[in-house]
């Protein structure tokens, strides 16, 4: 049975994704002091506990980025407060180092993503990279993705990220990424796996397809990206302690950059597909249409540039041009027909 202190902590967090992250950081504190369990933390004298948290902050200042430390402490505050332990949090926050300008804000270029894909030697890894590149999802979304969250829409796919969670949002896959995902699922079926709506979208490596499928973890995806980047030679330039492009987030940044620079893209829809809330939107946009159809119509505008393969992108652009030509020809034919009818009417009069 779970200890009551942990049950209170978990029940006080609404978002499943946040719960996982907070628990991870609570465990870091517990392991740092080699504490037996969660309830034993609460048995420590308040003054001693205050010193422990302060020392923990000062230790992290010698090891971690200044921007990381608050994210390690806020979960502790949530745990202690919901268990009625009062610490001097203002004093603790005064120990935080000054934040620094974040490095690693650059996005992967399309050419770099091509290199990454060339170093993905199995269908799963290729599908994961294209999934992130075309949907903009965080690496932390993968453990929660089920097949029921992914549905065909035209020649693309609709994806529900963090479904049934307060952070739920809709994004999409390009035709290129959709095909890679379908190829990966087909491989799993051929290996003997029975797929249903509750099957993980991406499963851990397996020897036999019949084995019970377990979702990939965030660590699995991150370590895969680390290996691929090392093999591709793309992890060389550092800014201080960080690389210019974040390992996983560089794909999400690429999505964000492309979709917001797309001609005639509605920014508020772009933010929704990126999983951002929009508290500062103008009043007249608070009633904007965020239906799947509306979001997909905006997403389609960005498909050519989100597509990684050059020949696929050129094919999409050519198809779009041919569609415009066909529409123009139909319009011209209608005008010609209308003019012909008018001439016939004039002659009859």
Regions found by a protein language model. Give the residues of each.
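Short, charged phosphate-coordinating catalytic segments
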Residues: 132-155, 267-272
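Basic, Lys/Arg- and aromatic-enriched nucleic-acid-binding interface segment
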Residues: 110-139, 252
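Conserved tyrosine-mediated DNA breakage-rejoining catalytic core shared by Y-recombinases
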Residues: 144-190, 197
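Catalytic-site neighborhood detector that most strongly recognizes the C-terminal catalytic loop/helix
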Residues: 107, 165, 261, 273-322
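Short, basic (Lys/Arg/His-rich) helix/loop patches that form interaction surfaces
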Residues: 222-272, 276-280
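Non-catalytic DNA-binding core/recognition domains of DNA-processing enzymes
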Residues: 11-86, 173
